[in-house]
Amino acid sequence: MQGNVIHVDKLYKMMYTDNYETIKKYLEYTVIDKTENYSTSANLIPFIPLHQAIEARNIDIIKSIITVDNVNQPGHDDTYPIHIICKEPNMLAISYMLRSINQCSVFNTLVKIKDMFNYRNVEIAKIILTNRYKNIQDIDLKYIDKKSKDDIIEITKLLFSYGADINMVDRHGNSPLHYATENPDQRLTRLLLSKGANPNILNKTNKSPLYYSIESDNPDITMLLIDKFIFNNTDPILSHAIKHYRKPILHALIENGASINARDKYGNTPLHYAVSYCKDIDVIKLLLERGVDVNAKSYIRNLTPLHSSYLKSPRVLKLLLQYGADINSLDSYSLTPLTSVVLQYLCIECGRIVVSHICCLKRIKPDIENSLGFIDNIDAITSNKRLNQIRLKCEDELNRMASIKITNTYSFDVFVLCDNITLLCKLVNNSIIDDILINSFNIYKGIILKNIYRSRKRLYLIENTLYVLNNTFKPNYMWNRLPVELQNYIMEYIDDASLKVMHEYEKHKLKY
């Protein structure tokens, strides 16, 4: 201090270290010097005393200088008081103060503590700066953490009582809620929402507070925001959650309106990120079951999710193909998902899945042989010794299945090439099937057994539901007057889940 002048840096440090009376005296009888020095030149600290007091969580000083006129006053960096209290403490400025008193080793410890307690460490900094500790391990971290959070709530309520604008945005377009969810602080978030904070405000990078809560990995805060968030079909929030692998909140996002087909600026959908980032089969299955576009192409290179998967996981590959992923789709470089990977590094199981699928496609859709993608895939397969051997085995198995007649119209290959469950149900109990050595079809054995099992399971459901219905209704009831063929025909249009519900419900009624 020179005469009646105090530099802004010194005043800032006093907010952390000095008592109320000393700071008050300086504020009343001195002029603040705002010339640049080692810290202010880097815009590390605020110039306005109220802003400094809020950063230091100095409640007594805040109470003595806050007014309705300065509660919404922006600082030199266009930051408002309500933003400061919602932000994490100014650890960079604190580090300068610690280094100035040769406390570098203590600062390193403080950084570790900061990571433990989600950046709520102003009280710990005060203890260190005022030398009120003998050993850093002696500090009651839980008590300090609680006090820091309590102070934040008290200061925030004080700002609101003087008219702080809950939805004021700073130069980055961030609202107080953006910062509260980024930290994160559940109590503070609840308080802001209760005071009317708008969770739908987008900052200059087009991110809402919900984006930051997802990044900070606090499901409780995220659920608070989801409940009040207004979703739209173009918001790629689901992709954001998948990129950060926030599996617990995905169901909530979808149920509350997050679009499963929304594209980000690169044209990627949630499925693109699910197969390339988290690679969690449950997440991928969830998206596919909800109707995500399995063949959506990105804006960059026209990549489908199958391209983005790089054919690395047999389970992912099988699931994508099961839901209609196009193995013959071409990207901007005229590469298919198969030709875009280095074939020598393609795992044996993935190679078998791809080749067996392509061989089936040729029989299901004969016209596909004229498509460029199919031609390129066949060329790649035949030019690779390992894949071509698989192709020859596939062709042999399909030819042998085609030679086994189940009826005058259908051959055994129907259990590989057909996905019509109604048709399979009509064929599955044919005695010829029981005589077939399914183990002789090494490549297609899994598909055959799966289709036989699911068709017999459905047939069992239909037959049992019919039995229960026929024994539930009175003889003169309309249902019992229908021909058996018509009853079966009606059952064909009811899905498995509904059949199961009907069966269990009527069985329960019969029991009682």
From Swiss-Prot:
Gene3D superfamilies: Ankyrin repeat-containing domain (1.25.40.20). Keywords: ANK repeat, Repeat. InterPro entries: Ankyrin_rpt, Ankyrin_rpt-contain_sf, PRANC_domain. The keyword Coiled coil does not apply. Pfam families: Ank, Ank_2, PRANC. Signal peptide: none annotated. ANK repeats lie at residues 45-73, 77-106, 136-168, 172-201, 205-236, 238-262, 266-296, 301-329. It comes from the Viruses. PANTHER family: ANKYRIN REPEAT AND PROTEIN KINASE DOMAIN-CONTAINING PROTEIN, ANKYRIN REPEAT-CONTAINING PROTEIN-RELATED. This is Putative ankyrin repeat protein FPV233. It comes from Fowlpox virus (strain NVSL). The lineage of its organism: Viruses, Varidnaviria, Bamfordvirae, Nucleocytoviricota, Pokkesviricetes.
